[in-house]
Regions:
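Secreted/periplasmic proteins
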Residues: 2-130
Length: 130
């Protein structure tokens, strides 16, 4: 393989590795506490605890129901907890609607929020992908 083909191949793999980061949307996350049923999407059907409620930004007239998102904490939204992030990401399923006035793009279950951030922060900056 000549140098130009090798360089092109290396650049392609590098860009492919960056693609998921480039497609991530930014927003904020808050959390809500149990009970998690009934929910707008599934009524009284229990969908576990790695769940979330969608704000108007992603609700899409119930089309968000069942969508899975990978959510990653990026940082604080206030001075209360300066470094809230755990360094982990969490995969959640949309099961509910966070009505107008919702304080976050995604309202995570308490368990999902605690997996990626200190709950004392209350609200965090996030990146999320489907």
């Amino acid at each position: 393989m000549d140098v130009s083909k090798a360089s092109l191949l290396a650049a392609t793999f590098l860009l492919a590795g960056l693609l998921p980061v480039a497609l991530a949307a930014s927003g904020t996350a808050t959390f809500y506490t149990p009970p998690y049923v009934p929910s707008a999407c599934y009524g009284f059907q229990n969908r576990g605890v790695m769940i979330a409620a969608a704000s108007d930004a992603i609700w899409d007239n119930r089309a968000a129901c069942g969508r899975r998102y990978r959510v990653t904490c990026r940082g604080p939204t206030n001075q209360g907890v300066l470094q809230p992030c755990t360094g982990r990401s969490v995969d959640v399923t949309i099961v509910d609607y966070c009505p107008a006035g919702c304080q976050g793009t995604i309202d995570l279950s308490q368990e999902a929020f605690a997996a990626i951030a200190n709950p004392d922060a209350g609200k965090i900056l996030i990146d999320y992908t489907r």
